[in-house]
Amino acid sequence: MSCQQNQQQCQPPPSCPSPKCPPKSPAQCLPPPSSDCALSSGGCGPSSESGCCLSHHRHFRSHQCRRQRSNSCDRGSGQQGGGSCRGHGSGGCC
């Protein structure tokens, strides 16, 4: 009888950590970023660290765009569009 109890106690642990781990991670990760993103409405700069939707990609693009815009636009490569070239570009900027 003692053996059966020991075997049963060994089987439940491996079954618990598997299902308990996956749901806990995504559940806790989904709510915080979703709330921050919705509140920011696409302009979550400091929230990107928390894992905002596309804020991280946008933040990075903004940095590269600023640098490229200064280099490309200054040279006259994207001066044609002026303010329009900001959103109209093959690389995201000019």
UniProtKB/Swiss-Prot annotation:
Segments for region (Disordered): 1-35, 65-94
Bias-annotated ranges (Gly residues): 78-94
Keywords per UniProt: Antimicrobial, Keratinization
Residue ranges with Low complexity bias: 1-10
Pfam families: LCE
Positions with biased composition (Pro residues): 11-34
DNA repair among keywords: no
GO BP of this protein: defense response to Gram-negative bacterium; defense response to Gram-positive bacterium; keratinization; killing of cells of another organism
InterPro entries: LCE
Expression sites by tissue: Skin-specific. Expression was readily detected in adult trunk skin, adult arm skin, fetal skin, penal skin, vulva, esophagus and tongue. Not expressed in the cervix, rectum, lung, colon, or placenta.
TM region positions: none
Oligomer and partners: Interacts with CYSRT1; the interaction is direct.
Record function comment: A structural component of the cornified envelope of the stratum corneum involved in innate cutaneous host defense. Possesses defensin-like antimicrobial activity against a broad spectrum of Gram-positive and Gram-negative bacteria, both aerobic and anaerobic species. Upon inflammation, may regulate skin barrier repair by shaping cutaneous microbiota composition and immune response to bacterial antigens.
Similarity-based family: Belongs to the LCE family.
The protein's name in its UniProt record: Late cornified envelope protein 3C
Gene assigned in the entry: LCE3C
